[in-house]
Amino acid sequence: MDWNRIEGNWKQFKGSAKEKWAKLTDDDLKLIEGRREQLEGRLQERYGKAKDQVRQDVDDWLKTLH
C-alpha cells in the first residue's frame, strides 16, 4: 500500500487508524486528513514515542492494509 492511496482515500482508512491508535481523537483524524507527517506528529504527541518508532509503527500499519 502506498501513501498516496491512503491520502486520497483517508475517509476509508481513518477507521483503521482509529482502531490501531485509540488515543487519536476524532479531531486528530480530521486534522491529519491523510497526511503521513501529520499522523506521525499526532502519534508522537499522544503516545510519547520517538519519531523513528512512530515511523516504524506507521510502516507496520501500512503493511496490514489491503
Swiss-Prot record:
Pfam families: CsbD. Belongs to the UPF0337 (CsbD) family. This is UPF0337 protein bsl1473. It comes from Bradyrhizobium diazoefficiens (strain JCM 10833 / BCRC 13528 / IAM 13628 / NBRC 14792 / USDA 110).
